[in-house]
Amino acid sequence: THYVDARTALKNSDIYSIVYQLSADLADGKLKATAPRAQGILNNPTKTSNAHAFWQSMYAQLLLGGECFAYRWRNDNGLDLYWEYLRPSQVQPFLLEDGSGLIYNVDFDEPEIGPMQAVPQGNMIHIRLMSRNGGKTGISPLSALSDELQIKDQSNKLTLSALARSIMAPGVLKIQHG
């Protein structure tokens, strides 16, 4: 089976449209927590964008890649200050040797932060959509679209080829009835 990456999938207008609509609809939903502090971070998770944009990014990545990540920046007392969205390419999860949980290696874009090794799972938001390995990682729904996208790609190539070989008349043919 051929792997479909998110960049390729988003060039397909149908996939782009459904991912955009679903992620926007999910981001419109209200996440509820019982503790006021937890509700505060859910309502305002990041310093770099509004809550809707943050959650739409998280849900879009979840729909495209099967999982999404955010780092939990905390104060000295362990209380969440804000969350930072992370691309999957910035995060590598590892199972602890005793199997009791996960740790993460995280590469931040900011040079002053740099890479962090062995980040405990309590410092990460890691949402997974289905799994084949007991919940360690998620499965991309795009893997199910591999054949369909290959067929569509070949159909598009055939159509473009046929159009390129079609006869282009340089003028207009006039017929006089007589």
Predicted features and spans:
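Structured, contiguous alpha/beta core segments that scaffold functional sites
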Residues: 1-178
